C-alpha cells in the first residue's frame, strides 16, 4: 500500500510503498478514503508533544473515514463494505491514517454518518470526542446551563457549541472579531476575546458567573475560565497544562476536570467509549444537529505535507483533509 511517512521530526513527508496490514482476529482492516488533520498532528510531527509521542520513521494522522475491507474472526460489530470513521492511530506506536489501509481496533470505530462524505466525516473524531468527554462525561451538561466556551471558532470549539446546543444549553463563546461569524453559525452568542472577563460576566450573567466553562485554548484562557465560572460551577479544559493558580476556583467551591482524548489510544483503556461517542455523534449529524467545517483546499497523499503547512499557517478556519483512494 501507499503511505506518507516522515523520517525525522519536523521533516517533510514522502510517499512510499509498505506492506498492507492484515486484520488480526480482533481487528478491522479499513480502506482509508480520507484522513482528517488536527493541530495536535503538527506537535506530534515536530516532536514537541511530550504527551503524544510517535517515533519516526512513521505514518501520522489521528482521524480517518473509510470502508471496511476485512474483519477478524472475533469481530462481530462490523461487516465488510460498511463505511466507518474514527480516531484510530498516529500516536503511541499505532500506524496513522495517512495511508491506504489501517488495521484498527473496532472499539475505536463507528458507522459513518450516512449524510456525510468521507471527507466530512474524517474531520470529526478527535474534536467531537474531546467535546463530548468534557461536556457530557465531565461537566454533565444539561438543559438550561449557561455554558462559556473559551475559544469557540476552532474544531473543538465549534463541536462543543453544537453538542451543548443539542443538550439545550445556553451557549456563549469567546473569539477574535474575525471569528464572530463562525461562532454564531455554530450556535453561540459571541464574546470578543479582548473584553475583560469581569465585564462580560457582569453583562451576560448579572455578575454570577457561568454554570460551566469549557476551555479549548489553555494558558490565559484557562485562568479566565476560573474567573468566569460561578460558585459551585465546573470548568473543563482540553489544554490544562502549565502552572495555574487554583485560588479563584477554590474560593468559589467550583470544580475542575481535564480532558485527555488520546488516553485510550496510548493506554488501550476506554476505547469502547470512544466508539460509543462516535455513534451518538453520528445520530446527531444525521438529525441535522451537528455539521463539520472544512477548508475548500484539496490534498492527496502526495501533497499531505502541504496540508500540514496550510494548517500551521492557519490558512482557513475550516479543517484540512487529505483525500486517499
Q: Where would I find each of the regions flagged by the language model?
A:
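Mid-domain Rossmann-like dinucleotide-binding core that forms the NAD(H)/NADP(H) cofactor-binding site
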Residues: 122-195
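Glycine-rich cofactor phosphate-binding loops and adjacent beta1-alpha1 units
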Residues: 189-257
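C-terminal capping/lid region of NAD(P)-dependent oxidoreductase domains
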Residues: 282-294, 305-325
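C-terminal substrate-binding/catalytic core of Rossmann-like NAD(P)-dependent dehydrogenases/reductases
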Residues: 248-297
Amino acid at each position: 500500500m501507499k503511505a506518507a511517512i516522515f523520517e525525522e521530526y519536523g521533516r517533510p513527508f514522502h510517499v512510499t510503498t509498505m506492506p498492507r496490514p492484515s486484520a488480526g482476529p480482533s481487528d478491522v482492516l479499513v480502506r482509508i478514503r480520507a484522513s482528517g488533520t488536527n493541530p495536535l498532528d503538527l506537535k506530534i510531527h515536530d516532536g514537541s508533544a511530550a504527551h503524544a509521542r510517535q517515533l519516526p520513521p512513521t505514518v501520522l494522522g489521528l482521524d480517518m473515514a473509510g470502508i471496511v475491507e476485512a474483519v477478524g474472526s472475533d469481530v462481530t460489530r462490523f461487516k465488510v463494505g460498511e463505511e466507518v470513521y474514527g480516531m484510530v492511530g498516529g500516536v503511541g506506536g499505532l500506524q496513522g491514517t495517512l495511508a491506504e489501509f489501517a488495521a484498527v481496533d473496532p472499539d475505536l470505530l463507528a458507522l459513518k454518518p450516512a449524510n456525510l462524505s468521507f471527507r466530512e466525516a474524517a474531520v470529526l473524531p478527535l474534536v467531537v470526542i474531546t467535546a463530548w468527554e468534557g461536556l457530557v462525561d465531565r461537566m454533565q451538561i444539561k438543559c438550561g446551563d449557561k455554558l462559556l466556551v473559551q475559544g469557540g471558532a476552532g474544531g473543538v470549539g465549534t463541536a462543543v457549541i453544537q453538542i451543548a446546543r443539542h443538550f439545550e444549553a445556553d451557549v456563549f463563546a469567546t473569539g477574535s472579531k474575525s471569528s464572530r461569524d463562525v461562532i454564531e453559525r455554530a450556535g453561540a452568542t459571541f464574546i470578543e476575546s479582548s473584553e475583560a472577563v469581569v465585564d462580560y460576566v457582569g453583562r451576560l450573567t448579572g455578575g454570577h458567573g457561568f454554570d460551566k466553562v469549557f476551555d479549548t485554548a489553555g494558558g490565559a484562557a484557562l485562568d479566565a475560565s476560573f474567573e468566569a465560572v460561578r460558585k459551585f460551577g465546573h470548568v473543563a479544559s482540553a489544554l490544562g497544562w502549565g502552572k495555574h493558580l487554583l485560588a479563584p476556583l477554590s474560593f468559589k467551591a467550583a470544580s475542575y476536570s481535564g480532558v485527555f482524548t488520546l488516553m485510550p489510544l496510548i493506554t488501550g483503556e476506554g476505547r469502547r467509549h470512544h466508539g460509543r461517542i462516535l455513534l451518538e455523534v453520528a445520530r446527531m449529524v444525521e438529525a441535522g444537529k451537528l455539521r463539520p467545517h472544512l477548508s475548500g483546499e484539496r490534498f492527496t497523499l502526495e501533497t499531505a505535507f502541504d496540508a500540514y503547512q496550510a494548517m500551521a499557517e492557519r490558512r482557513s478556519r475550516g479543517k484540512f483533509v487529505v483525500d486517499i483512494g
